[in-house]
């Protein structure tokens, strides 16, 4: 199982088994990461922890453990096993971070499988009559259980409807996801499946007044942010021109090693993100670098797609091929990537959860009906908006991009800190639609940063008329850039050349969107697109209308229609079938018992 997950040269791995308990486990982790020095054991070596991801604690927690006589090792995660000794079954609800793990308690002849309360760090599982298999990447299960190498029809339907699978389902037949905030215990051959956390706990909190919320948020954010700067190596700050990374920069804690800032960008054009992020870094006295797409991104695009699909178990495909490319370059600057991602979802009600309007002609008739029905069926009406964001949208719809990042760097965001999310539930009703508390935090902690506008025209020193004009201009440019790229409706495709001429003449093309897959699929990557679609047509994969595939390729490459989403769907599922079903080696050396692989 381990070999399927050890696909980077900087990964470390190991195995651990307790045959008398029927446990055979292994782990994979990037070197010098939080989990790279496992297994974590207590002094008597009768409690063992295998871990994936990261967990954050205040210094007081470690001090308290030492005062109680525990010998904490040098490894970043060594304190966890001692916290379990002290807390027992209450251990899991004390954890703060994105993680999954397996505790083997030899004293009780008992084991616990658990994940973070949001389910961002996944555990895939499959149960047979005589064993339970689980792994943090689905490919590890497919490696040893070839009978699972088939698509789950409902999972594929959800994927084509929303770009993700929902409510514990996966792309693979017989493989499920551990529910959010779960702890499964194993004892004497029995498995007890429980949850240690429910969002209802946070939903039941009292609502604060606006003034109290603003004050509490400032105090909480400044107190919790230093956790995310703890590292044995330099921190890399993935900096944009948006509000959420600006809040981080406004409240920068003292660090032993000065962080480095960087911004992802396209080949040549300087985006607003790049220009404004550089100004933010300069105000904070930090170095800033631009990480650009290079010619090798296009010349090696097929391998970038395959690498992305493999690392994310098929949840990110051709439209995300840049993620590992950029994060690999970011790793050269720092193995830890701190971002402002998910701040909008948790604090301001931003949502990207909506159906993908794929052309019905792409799909076979039965699948087209199923996808349409699925898109109509799923709704989050009546659900608390933060519960939906933190426990549904982020671990389901937004899973793939952080997963690609985590394959290269330690991915961190303060906006999923337990204290921040819990506090967000107490915001007055109007706060999630307002940015006032965000602006007040920035102004209070680094007034100079509030004078630099965001990419959407917010903040900055200007009178009301100038500020309003800037916001209107920024939002208009952003919308035009979106239309020029993946957002161009097929019915407006005939205006493609006019839109390109307009944005070029106004010198606004690429100011917001440096990822131009729609255009790349017409030009630099046209040969790749046509080759893959013809290959799929030859194999006649059952999902598609084979007669439409060649037509789709021609229509897109010539610029007559925008089929960028359809191309991505076909390319991604083709790569899943090829990499994870047909070409994935089979591993005969496995035990039919409780088996785990972590990475």
Identify the residue ranges that each predicted region occupies.
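Cysteine-centered catalytic environments shared across enzyme families
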Residues: 1-296, 304-305, 571, 577-579, ...
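Adenosyl-5′-phosphate
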Residues: 10-12, 18-19, 174-179, 319, ...
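Short, hydrophobic/amphipathic alpha-helical packing segments
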Residues: 218-225, 320-327, 331
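ATP-dependent adenylate-handling ligase core
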Residues: 266-327, 344-362, 378-381, 408-409, ...
């Amino acid at each position: 199982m381990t070999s399927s997950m050890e696909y980077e040269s900087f990964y470390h791995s190991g195995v651990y088994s307790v045959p008398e308990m029927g446990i055979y486990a292994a782990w994979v982790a990037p070197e010098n990461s939080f989990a790279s020095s496992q297994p974590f054991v207590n002094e008597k070596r009768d409690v063992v922890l295998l871990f994936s991801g990261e967990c954050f604690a205040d210094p007081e927690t470690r001090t308290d453990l030492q005062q109680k006589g525990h010998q904490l090792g040098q490894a970043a995660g060594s304190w966890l096993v001692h916290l379990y000794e002290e807390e027992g079954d209450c251990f899991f609800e004390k954890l703060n971070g994105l993680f999954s793990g397996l505790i083997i308690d030899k004293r009780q002849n008992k084991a616990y499988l658990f994940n973070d309360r949001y389910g961002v760090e996944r555990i895939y599982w499959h149960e047979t009559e005589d064993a339970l298999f689980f792994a943090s990447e689905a490919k590890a299960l497919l490696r040893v259980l070839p009978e699972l190498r088939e698509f789950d029809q409902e999972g594929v339907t959800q994927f084509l409807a929303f770009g993700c699978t929902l409510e514990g389902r996966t792309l693979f037949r017989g493989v499920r996801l551990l529910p959010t905030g779960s702890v499964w215990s194993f004892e004497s051959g029995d498995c007890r499946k429980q949850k240690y956390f429910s969002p209802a706990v946070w939903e039941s909190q009292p609502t604060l007044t606006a003034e109290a919320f603003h004050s509490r948020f400032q105090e909480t954010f400044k107190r919790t942010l230093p956790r995310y700067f703890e590292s044995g190596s330099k921190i890399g700050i993935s900096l944009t021109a948006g509000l959420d990374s600006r809040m981080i920069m406004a409240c920068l804690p003292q660090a032993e090693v000065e962080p480095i800032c960087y911004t992802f960008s396209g080949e040549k054009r300087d985006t607003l993100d790049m220009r404004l992020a550089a100004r933010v870094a300069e105000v904070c006295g930090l170095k800033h670098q631009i990480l650009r797409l290079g010619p090798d991104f296009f010349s090696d695009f097929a391998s970038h797609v395959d690498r992305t699909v493999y690392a994310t178990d098929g949840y990110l495909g051709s439209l995300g091929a840049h993620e590992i490319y950029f994060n690999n370059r970011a790793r050269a600057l720092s193995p830890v990537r701190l971002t402002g991602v998910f701040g909008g979802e948790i604090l301001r009600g931003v949502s990207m959860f909506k159906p993908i309007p794929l052309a019905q002609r792409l799909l076979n008739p039965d699948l087209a009906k199923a996808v349409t029905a699925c898109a109509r069926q799923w709704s989050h009406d009546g659900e608390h908006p933060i519960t939906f964001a933190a426990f549904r949208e982020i671990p389901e719809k937004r899973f793939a991009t952080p997963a690609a990042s985590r394959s290269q760097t330690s991915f961190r965001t303060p906006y999923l800190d337990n204290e921040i999310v819990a506090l967000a539930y107490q915001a007055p009703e109007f706060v999630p639609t307002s940015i006032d508390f965000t602006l007040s935090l920035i102004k209070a902690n680094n007034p100079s940063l509030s004078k630099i506008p965001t990419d959407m025209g917010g903040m900055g020193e200007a009178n009301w008329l100038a500020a309003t004009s800037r916001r209107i201009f920024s939002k208009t440019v952003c919308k035009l850039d979106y239309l020029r790229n993946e957002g161009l409706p097929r019915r407006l495709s005939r205006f493609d050349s006019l839109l390109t001429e307009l944005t070029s003449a106004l010198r606004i093309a690429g100011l917001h969107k440096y990822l131009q897959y729609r255009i790349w699929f017409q030009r630099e990557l046209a040969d790749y697109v046509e080759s893959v679609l013809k290959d799929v047509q030859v194999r006649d994969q059952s999902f598609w209308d084979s007669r439409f595939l060649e037509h789709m390729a021609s229509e897109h490459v010539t610029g007559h229609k925008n089929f960028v989403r359809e191309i991505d769907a076909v390319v991604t599922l083709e790569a899943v079938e090829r990499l994870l079903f047909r070409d994935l080696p089979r591993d005969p050396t496995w035990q039919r018992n409780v088996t785990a692989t972590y990475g």
